[in-house]
Amino acid sequence: MSKQFVRSAKNMMKGYSSTQVLVRDATANDSRTPSIDTLDDLAQRSYDSVDFFEIMDMLDKRLNDKGKYWRHVAKSLTVLDYLVRFGSENCVLWCRENFYVIKTLREFRHENESGFDEGQIIRVKAKELVSLLNDEERLREERSMNTRNRRANRAARPRPRRQRTRSNPHDSSPSYQDDLEKALEESRITAQEDEQRRRELAQYDDEDPDFQAALQLSKEEEELKQLQELQRLQKQQQSLSQFQAPLQQQQPQQQPAYYDIFGNPISQDEYLQYQYQQDQEQAMAQQRWLDQQQEQQQLAEQQYFQQQQQAAAAASALQQQQTAANMQQQQQQPADFQQPLPTGSNNPFSMDNLERQKQEQQHAQLQRQQEEARQQQEQLKLQQLQRQQQEEAQLHQKRQEEAQLQQQQAQLLQQQAQFQQQQPLKQTRTGNQSISDKYSDLNTLLATGTGIDTFGNTGEARIPAQHTKTGTFINSQGTGYKQVTNEPKNNPFLSNQYTGLPSTNIVPTQTGYGFGNQPQSPPTNSPQQNPTGISYSQPQQQQQPQQQPQYMQNFQQQQPQYAQNFQQQPQYTQNYQQQPQYIQPHQQQQQQQQQQQQQQGYTPDQGVSLIDL
């Protein structure tokens, strides 16, 4: 009575409306359960927008209350479940918007001072409401059926008025009598509604979802009352046991209450049987796990042993293939090891047959992989052998070609040497024939060593003698190297004196465009070249000694004319200066040619060109 007074005072002080007061009374923190009339009244008021917001605001506060006010949470879930089933559609929408709040309550826990968990009933209600909200088809069917039932109830009775008048109960005025009659009439109508509802529920089949939901709610309320009664009795026994005698303390204490996973109280035997079943299932699961681990380990060992055998077989096959690669014959593959025949049950659904099938499949797969690996290795080896054979053939062919080239080169060199030995060196003309013919007399004069130079010198004082003395001087062109021979001279005038160039057999040199580098022939005297009719060729052996003074006299008379003609030819000096110099390889080649000519007995021309000047 005191709690109701305090609650009424709070309602007046905080200015709660009639709807909010009704929600607070339905979710009060006491052992009473909300009545069906109160829940139906809240469901009717949920169709009004103002009352709907007031109801949901108060329920939201109750659902988020502290753990010690667990009754607020449990009764709020009961009211909310009834509104979802019998209230307006806005109640369903609000629950879906605040779905996380209801889902969180599935883990609600609160233990009292004695260690008892008070959150069991809250968890059960929250799970039931969450499953109902998730199943839209079931929710739609329940709401449609409840709507038809509510309309039938409204047609059966008129709705009473909610006019409330404040009057003194001890007043004997007519208004008090009217209120009393109205209250009696309302109680009678409520009793009739309850009776009619019980009759309707009795007519429902046990499989009706609405009937099952209502029955579940009534069971939960009854269980909640029983739990509360048990807790009260436990507290009383604990308080009495503290003041009992030692003999009474030795008596066995009351056994604790046991509950199943749904929060329903069960006996100790049922609880022990449930625990035994759980332990047995856990032991069976653990045994199955151990069996699976052993099977996996055995399978791994078998696979490892098979891999070792396959590796050994592959090594032996590789050796055989290497030895038979040259013969190019296909070798037989090593036979597989004989597997033990399985024995046991013929049941196709037994675990042994399934494991055996798995092992056979794995073994067949491993054999296919090994066969593919062997084929790939054989192909690679054949390719390598083909490459080696091709490389060896290419090397052999290259060696044969090189040997043939060397043999051909040796034959060519031998033929060239034989050809050079068979054919003597031919005289080549390197000068200008017209110039040589024009100045043949001067060339002959200089070659014989008689006469004087342009400066009037005679004998060894002649300028050409300093540059054309063979055997003692070598010019830049190589003239004079090993040109002195021991053959007898035909000139009788060179036996006692040395006037210019000695009469030696000189090898003709190919020195460019200088005159005098052509085969020397006795000059033909013409009236134009020699008006005196005297020949200036080399004196022959048949000439008489008494003719020498006349020859010298005639030569001295004609000397100025020859010197003048020689001075008028600057072109020959330029040609001589422009001649390229031979390098050492050319000199060596010339020396070899001279030696070959001397061995063959070839006598070169004794003429000397003007370029030697």
Swiss-Prot record:
Disordered: annotated span: 140-208, 323-351, 356-375, 471-613
Composition-biased stretches (Polar residues): 340-350, 471-512
Location in the cell: Cytoplasm; Membrane
GO biological process: actin cortical patch assembly; actin filament organization; endocytosis
InterPro entries: ENTH (IPR013809), ENTH_VHS (IPR008942), UIM_dom (IPR003903)
Gene3D superfamilies, per database record: 1.25.40.90
GO (cellular component) term, any one: endosome
Low complexity: compositionally biased ranges: 323-339, 526-600
GO molecular function annotations of the record: clathrin binding; K48-linked polyubiquitin modification-dependent protein binding; K63-linked polyubiquitin modification-dependent protein binding; phospholipid binding
Top-rank taxon, per record: Eukaryota
Stated role: Binds to membranes enriched in phosphatidylinositol 3,5-bisphosphate (PtdIns(3,5)P2) and phosphatidylinositol 4,5-bisphosphate (PtdIns(4,5)P2). Required for endocytosis and localization of actin.
Further remarks about this protein from its record: Present with 1970 molecules/cell in log phase SD medium.
Designated name of the protein: Epsin-2
Organism: Saccharomyces cerevisiae (strain ATCC 204508 / S288c)
